[in-house]
């Protein structure tokens, strides 16, 4: 019931966040990122590479009242693993919390859900962005995410 619905909601939010990341690389993804109330802004984004796996970690903060929830603040901490040795990406962990920092989704962690990242797919675009030689050095890309996400959601409202 309720917990399953929250998992679904957070997964939907995760896809939107990663769509925003992808829209930094391929502008046509911008249109997919517009779902008001899902997340107000991206608080941080980081890349960490271990061998062939790149972990993209993102934290979003939103005002869930706009989306019909009771909490005043909603923080979602999530990660996506990109396997540069194959065509797979996975959204791996998601934890949501309220303003006090208390976890509101019972410490929600997911097992990696791998799906194929084809050339034109969201995962494929992110994979190209982080797996290309030198991609990890493109720090300005990460620095721009916060302003870019805020602008996307401002336009969406």
Per-range role (PLM):
Residues 1-157:
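N-terminal secretory-pathway/extracellular module detecting exported/lumenal segments
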């Amino acid at each position: 019931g309720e917990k399953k619905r929250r998992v679904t909601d957070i997964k939907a939010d995760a896809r939107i966040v990663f769509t925003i990341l992808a829209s930094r690389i391929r502008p046509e993804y911008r249109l997919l990122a517009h779902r008001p109330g899902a997340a107000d802004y991206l608080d941080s984004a980081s890349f960490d590479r271990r061998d062939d796996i790149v972990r993209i970690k993102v934290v979003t903060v939103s005002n869930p009242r706009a989306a019909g929830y009771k909490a005043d603040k909603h923080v979602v901490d999530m990660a996506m693993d990109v396997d540069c040795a194959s065509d797979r990406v996975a959204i791996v962990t998601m934890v949501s919390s309220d303003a006090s920092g208390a976890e509101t989704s019972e410490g929600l962690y997911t097992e990696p859900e791998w799906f194929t990242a084809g050339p034109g797919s969201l995962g494929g675009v992110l994979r190209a962005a982080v797996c290309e030689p030198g991609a990890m050095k493109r720090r300005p890309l990460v620095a721009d995410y916060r302003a870019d996400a805020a602008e996307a959601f401002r336009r969406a409202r």
